[in-house]
Amino acid sequence: MSRTMMIITVVVVVWAVLFAIFMLLDKKRKDAQNSFSEENRDKALVHLYCKNIKIDNKPLSEADYTIGEYLQKIVALTSGLHTIEGIFESTDTVMGKTRNVKSEKVSFELDLEAGNKYTVGMYFNSAQENKDADKAILEIPLSLYRESDNIEAYIIAYRET
């Protein structure tokens, strides 16, 4: 067997083993997420695409949460008004260049209803521009400088039901 064939065989075997391992890990994560959603169907499920999260002035570690498919935090909260705080980040490609945008710590209140699913994240277009204005329950415009009228991004909360 030639040296090249041996290297190719080793690479294929390693790839196959790693592929199987990651498929199992992904299945385990999906099962955990589905189980979490089922166990908390009587609560509001909030998908948060941010970091350094505090809910009602308590760290995320004190809340009932799991990690979602896109590394978002899925938090189960009771109905009512909740204060959410976090640092939001997003990436955009403008004219072939990648632009990373990161907010300062942003705090806002959301009135949640049990049995609904909510998504909170940073977007570069408003809910109206995305034609999702009917689903948006909160929209916070962000600018590069305080008091500026030049809106760079939005933090939007959508109700998915």
Feature-to-residue mapping (PLM):
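Short loop/turn and low-complexity linker motifs enriched in small/turn-promoting residues
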Residues: M1-A76, I87-T161
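A short tyrosine-centered beta-strand micro-motif
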Residues: G80-E85
